[in-house]
A protein has these predicted regions:
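Short, glycine-/aromatic-enriched active-site segment of Class I SAM-dependent methyltransferases
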Residues: 197-224, 229-235, 258-261
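Short N-terminal helix/helix-N-cap motif within the alpha/beta-hydrolase-1
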Residues: 176-180, 207
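A short His-aromatic
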Residues: 170, 174
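A short glycine-rich, Lys/Arg-flanked "PGG" loop and its adjoining helix->strand segment in the class I
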Residues: 179-194
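Membrane-proximal basic amphipathic "stem/tether" segments
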Residues: 211-214, 251-300
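Feature marks short, surface-exposed loop/turn motifs that line or immediately flank catalytic pockets
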Residues: 203-205, 249-252
């Protein structure tokens, strides 16, 4: 790695996962380029912010109420509470058919506490970890959780084997060192405990069809792009055995306004055609482009 100007920007000249210097540039949207490793298939963004710069993005409330959610952040994360709660209910119904019936659960990157709230509904003692107090305070102030740790997972002080279930929704694509993140999660899991990891699939048919217009190419924040093979390798290197990988439950409930906003990335005319949907008020739709994967892995 070489640091280029400005000083907070890092140029990534080797695969962050396998270390190979053999890669191709999938496409460029200056100042960013998306590279693909020719050895393992991982995708990554270069240049990217350093760790402090990345952390700073999520501390600013403009990330959680973004004027340009197509490229960074969310239009209004807190106001979509009902959509997130129902999304997590649907996902956890799938997970808990295969996971522990209760116990202690940790949501990594818990944001406003929506998944924690559903875990509590399902009978778990819910904990969270969140680097942004800006959004994490919602879990405390709105849901009454006093079990949110503010900081990276590496600073959590719970004893090894403390948790029966750990969830990571839309986390690994944001972090500089996902290998260390997962190793820490492995230490925190009880023997036989379950890790649930969800991230985008750069090799999904939808991602391939859209190319640079794929809505998960948000270069300032999504700095890594995984495939099923790279996720499985990463988990095994951390001491976790992947048991199931599915795209079926990676969808989410969204507002009609969200659909119109995302359509703008595909074509302005499509966005204009769908704009009347925004007049439907609180109407919602369950969307699944089969481009997000959920992996269940055991601590063995």
């Amino acid at each position: 790695m070489a640091v280029s100007a400005p000083a907070a920007t890092v140029t990534i000249a080797r695969c962050p996962m396998c270390g190979s210097d053999r890669f191709r540039t999938a496409f460029a949207e200056p100042p960013y380029s998306v590279h693909r490793c020719e050895r393992c298939g991982l995708g990554w963004v270069s240049p990217r912010l350093g760790e402090e710069g990345l952390a700073g993005i999520y501390q600013d409330d403009s990330y959680w109420r973004s004027g340009s959610p197509k490229t960074l952040g969310y239009s209004d994360y807190r106001s979509d509470q009902r959509l997130y709660l129902d999304t997590f209910r649907r996902r956890l119904d799938f997970v808990l058919r295969r996971g522990p019936p209760g116990g202690r659960a940790l949501d990594v990157g818990c944001a406003a506490g929506f998944c924690m709230a559903v875990l509590r509904e399902r009978g778990f003692e819910a904990y969270g970890v969140e680097i942004s107090e800006t959004i994490g305070s919602h879990a405390r102030d709105h849901f009454g959780f006093d079990t949110v740790h503010f900081g990276p997972l590496s600073t959590v002080t719970h004893p090894d084997g403390f948790f029966d279930l750990i969830t990571m929704w839309d986390v690994v694509e944001h972090v500089v060192d996902p290998r260390e993140l997962l190793r820490k999660a492995r230490r925190l899991l009880a023997p036989g405990g379950l890790l649930v990891l969800e991230t985008q699939d750069i090799d999904s048919p939808f991602a391939r069809a859209l190319g640079p217009r794929w809505h998960h190419y948000k270069h300032a924040e999504h700095i890594l792009h995984f495939t099923p093979a790279t996720v499985r390798t990463l988990l095994r290197e951390a001491g976790l055995e992947p048991r199931q990988l599915t795209h079926r439950y990676g969808g989410k409930y969204v507002s009609t306004a969200f659909i119109a906003e995302r359509a703008a990335r595909l074509h302005p005319a499509l966005s204009a055609a769908l704009r009347p949907l925004t007049q439907l008020g609180s109407a919602r739709v369950y969307l699944n482009f089969m481009d997000e994967m959920i992996v269940l892995a055991r601590a063995e």
